A protein has these predicted regions:
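Short, surface-exposed interaction loops/tails
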Residues: 104-131
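Aliphatic-rich helix starts adjacent to a transmembrane/signal segment
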Residues: 17-18, 26-48
Length: 131
């Protein structure tokens, strides 16, 4: 009587290993894409909050735009939103957020551009309503 050895062949094991590897790669690529989309949405939310803080609160009260923005002069905006997802404060080197005032006299500006660099899309830009 001969004993028959049961188990998987090398080909079967290799096939399963390749399949698991491909599934892992697909998972991590998809995970990265979701993280990038979430980060881009966070940036858009921050820029929109700053924009509406300037347009709906600051400008009606002062009739001008500030030369720089921070939680000191835009109290209606969550202070955490002035820091990009990488932890860099707006208008500092390496920040994903830029506030560019224009037509300024004595720190009182007539217009501005708010911008955020996005990874999956074109830059997100908001300009002042009152030019």
């Amino acid at each position: 009587m001969t004993k028959r050895i049961t188990g998987f062949t090398v080909i079967e094991l290799l096939f399963v290993a390749v399949l698991v590897g491909l599934a892992s790669v697909l998972f991590f690529v998809q995970k990265h894409n979701l993280e990038v989309v979430a980060q881009d949405n966070t940036k858009k939310t921050a820029i929109n909050a700053m924009y509406y803080g300037l347009e709906e609160v600051f400008y009606p009260a002062n009739k001008y735009y500030p030369q720089s923005i921070s939680s000191d002069n835009l109290k209606s905006v969550d202070p955490a939103l002035f820091t990009d997802p990488n932890g860099v404060i707006i208008n500092t080197a390496g920040s994903a957020y830029t506030y560019s005032p224009t037509n300024c006299v004595d720190s009182k500006c007539k217009s501005y551009t708010l911008e955020s660099t996005l990874e999956n899309e074109d830059d997100f830009v908001k300009t002042s309503r009152n030019n």
